[in-house]
Amino acid sequence: MRDALASEVEATGDLARVTVGSITDRAGLTRRTFYSHYHDIADLVSQTEDDVLRDLRGLVADVASVRLEDLYETIDELEPCPGSVELLEYFKANGHVLTALLGQGGDPAFVEKIKVMVHEVVAGRALDGIDARALGAFFDYYLTFAISAEVGVLLRWLAGGMREGVDVMARIMTLLMFVRPGDLYDNTMDFNIPAYGLAVMQRLINTEEDSDDE
């Protein structure tokens, strides 16, 4: 029924226009069969998304568990981040349903659910070994930026019909994590990110202290 749901979203261009009747007709099933599994269309969508989120949580955790030292080594060897191929293979295998739900006619809230899940999985691992002075707003915005960027790349890949192979896309996403301003224009901006970030955080702390004194 999930493939039928995806096909109906594609056919109508809008999840809100999908009906139980259209899904059962496309799937060659009876309404009784549908209602023996789901309460309504919203329940079908919810269960589908919950299953995807559960599957993705484990795959994202595998990627997040990679140590920076190991990641640097794989990049030197022009290999993708460990775990990224498996993650993309999941998207490829479930591309029909994921493209429908994450596309323009799908469920806008689903993208945010994925971002929240990734944040939950990655945040704890990202804190390991971090300079305590970088915690707070700077770290939160950095994580939000990184997650939104990676999820955005995945959505672009889906929307483009996943033309690039999994191995190629895994390497692209790995490299994108380390692209600096100017890298693509032979004019790399090589500046001290930790020092800059800590200076920004110190300004924030000073501003908050000044506000408390007023």
Briefly describe each language-model feature range.
Residues 3-7, 26, 43-66, 82, ...:
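Alpha-helical structural segments
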Residues 3-6, 10, 24, 37, ...:
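Localized chelating/binding microdomains
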Residues 123, 127, 140, 148, ...:
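C-terminal peripheral helix-coil segments that are non-catalytic and often amphipathic
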Residues 105-131, 137-152, 182:
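Amphipathic alpha-helical packing segments from all-alpha helical-bundle domains
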Residues 60-96:
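Hydrophobic alpha-helical connector segments
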Residues 11-43:
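Helix-turn-helix
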Residues 8, 55-59, 63, 94, ...:
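A short secondary-structure junction motif
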Residues 17-18, 99-101, 166:
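Short, hydrophobic secondary-structure boundary micro-motifs
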